[in-house]
């Protein structure tokens, strides 16, 4: 169920619309459109949902500025670092106020400092907007920013960490 709707019972058209309107995505490869500027990449989600208006354009710029990209919003992806590109992808995932944000290895190509900045910002924005977020990562250090950890091994759920102390012990390398 998503927002009270049975996703399995939906038609393909309904599922596509639901994904486009209610789910934000960011992946290991940021999948930015190379010939669109940072702000145009973010606005793309609103354009696809036919919701790009003046307020949406302002929100795109505010979100990029909040992510430290005010000076880069008119740059093409190839003119930005990996961390900057990933922050553009985060802005794009959040611009349409989705109910759920999925992040698949969002820090895989980043150095530790940049990875922390990206995940901390991402988690902060998700909490601030009162959204649900799911992050897939092999980097246990990134679990510092989450509320719950589901540990998988060989495709099976082996443990759920829910308490802050339990999660921080996992982050510090106590168990994994």
Regions found by a protein language model. Give the residues of each.
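Conserved beta-strand-loop-alpha-helix hinge in the C-terminal portion
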Residues: 156-176
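ABC family nucleotide-binding domain
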Residues: 1-145, 149-152
């Amino acid at each position: 169920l998503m927002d009270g709707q049975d996703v399995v019972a939906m038609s393909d058209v309904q599922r596509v619309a639901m994904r486009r309107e209610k789910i934000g995505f960011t992946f290991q490869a940021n999948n930015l459109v190379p010939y669109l500027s940072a702000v145009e990449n973010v606005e793309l989600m609103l354009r696809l949902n036919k919701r790009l208006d003046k307020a949406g354009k302002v929100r795109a710029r505010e979100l990029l500025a909040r992510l430290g990209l005010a000076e880069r919003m008119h740059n093409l992806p190839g003119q930005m670092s990996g961390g900057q590109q990933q922050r553009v992808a985060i802005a794009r995932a959040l611009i349409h106020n989705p109910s759920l944000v999925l992040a698949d290895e969002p820090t895989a190509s980043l150095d530790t400092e940049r990875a922390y900045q990206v995940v901390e910002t991402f988690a902060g924005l998700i909490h601030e907007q009162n959204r649900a977020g799911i992050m897939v990562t092999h980097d246990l250090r990134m679990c510092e920013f989450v509320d719950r950890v589901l540990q998988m091994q060989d495709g099976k759920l082996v443990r759920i960490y829910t308490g802050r102390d339990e999660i921080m012990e996992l982050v510090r390398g106590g168990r994994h």
